[in-house]
């Protein structure tokens, strides 16, 4: 844990410039500067903030024109756009947890990364399993994405996206890395409308999952959402219920599950600020430490394979490595070798 027990955070509740990478990067840098100017040491962004969540996928199964536009406006790590964001973090000496549609070649992934206050990318991951219609746009991750918690001067910061918060094994692996501040990234979250719509995709469901995560992990949870306005409805030709305006539900949740912040209006852009007292984590984990004294590893334990599985492997490695099995000594190069 950081030597200082007080951390000021800025949780965004803003609207991206939909399907416009350059303009959304401009806005990202402005928000970084504003948050730092208000004393924040950490700023968080929602799922697929860059270039906005592809909400049309829930309205129709295929839209090749929009997909092509979306691909061309998704963010590559090795790009001037990413360098601008990293430079903004360094200039303003603030940690950034970013949500992005990650472009790797001609494939897309729901990505998250942490940029430290020197501008270095210290964590990058992909959503383990895109949810339902998301699979028409995004690919899956591999083992490296399980390493989603990083130790920073402000504390141990981790991140998951959307319905990863109902994946018990993934959650436990995140918690067991010693997480203290957790970024819970979502797109927009509207109040449940009744009928056949899934409660778990609603504001109540997303907020509830984030509060349960706080309880289970005894960590601070920064629930981060976007705002959906009429420009998005028009650009993506959205139909009910996805044409509903608003969707902002950003919040800061304490390690015991309570909300620490008042909500902004759902259709209003702004920051949710909070000053975290990390000593509260110690108090909560004294009662419940699910990765320590409140566990039974003699009876229940989690197996994990954090190796990255690539599309091309040297002869002799392919069969075993593809399934996460051990390979003969000397056949696997150490990462970075």
Swiss-Prot record:
A Pfam family that the UniProt record links to this protein: CN_hydrolase
Temperature dependence: Optimum temperature is 38 degrees Celsius.
InterPro entries attached to this UniProt entry: C-N_Hydrolase (IPR003010), C-N_Hydrolase_sf (IPR036526), Nitrilase/CN_hydratase_CS (IPR000132), Nitrilases_CHs (IPR044149)
Top-level lineage group: Eukaryota
Key words, A-Z: Hydrolase
Active site: 47, 127, 162
Keyword Nuclease in annotation: no
pH-activity dependence text: Optimum pH is 7.0-9.5.
Listed EC numbers: 3.5.5.1, 3.5.5.5
Enzyme class label: hydrolase
CDD domains: nitrilases_CHs
Region ranges (Disordered): 311-337
GO MF annotation: an example: arylacetonitrilase activity
CN hydrolase domain sequence ranges: 7-278
S-S bridge residues: none
Annotated catalysed reactions: a nitrile + 2 H2O = a carboxylate + NH4(+); 4-chlorophenylacetonitrile + 2 H2O = 4-chlorophenylacetate + NH4(+)
Record flagged with keyword Transferase: no
PANTHER family: ARYLACETONITRILASE (PTHR46044:SF14), NITRILASE (PTHR46044)
Function as written in the Swiss-Prot or TrEMBL entry: Nitrilase that hydrolyzes preferentially phenylacetonitrile, but also (R,S)-mandelonitrile, and 2-phenylpropionitrile.
Family: Belongs to the carbon-nitrogen hydrolase superfamily. Nitrilase family.
Protein name: Arylacetonitrilase
